[in-house]
Amino acid sequence: MKDFKEILDYAYSVKDDFYIKDIRECLALSEDDFAEKGFNVSVDTLQHWENHNYKLSDLSSGQRQRFRQFLFGLTRFFYRMIYGDDVADIERMFSHK
C-alpha cells in the first residue's frame, strides 16, 4: 500500500496526457470510488476507458473539470492527513505573491 505522501506527490503531478488507469492505480483508488467520485460515471464506463487506454485529455471538458475538483479535494484531504489541520493557514501564507 502506498503512503499518503507518495499519493499526494503523484496527485500534484497529474496531467491531461496521463492514462486514466495509471491515475487510478497511482492514487490507490478502487474502480467504484474512482468512477463515482472522480467522474460521476459507472464502473462499466471507467473500465471501457481503461481497457481502451483513454487519457485524461480524451474525456470531455466537463469530465476533466469534475475530475480536477475531485483531485483538489483529494489533495487537501491527504495534505491534512500528513501535515495536520492548519492547512488553511499554510495555503493563505503561500497564496500571496
What annotation goes with each model-predicted range?
Residues 2-27:
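A short, Lys/Arg-rich alpha-helix, primarily the initiator
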Residues 7-10, 76-97:
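Short, charged recognition helix plus adjacent turn
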Residues 28-48:
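Short alpha-helical DNA-recognition segment
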Residues 1, 5, 33, 59-80:
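DNA major-groove recognition helix of helix-turn-helix/homeodomain DNA-binding modules
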Residues 41-42, 52-54, 85:
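The DNA-recognition helices of helix-turn-helix-type DNA-binding domains
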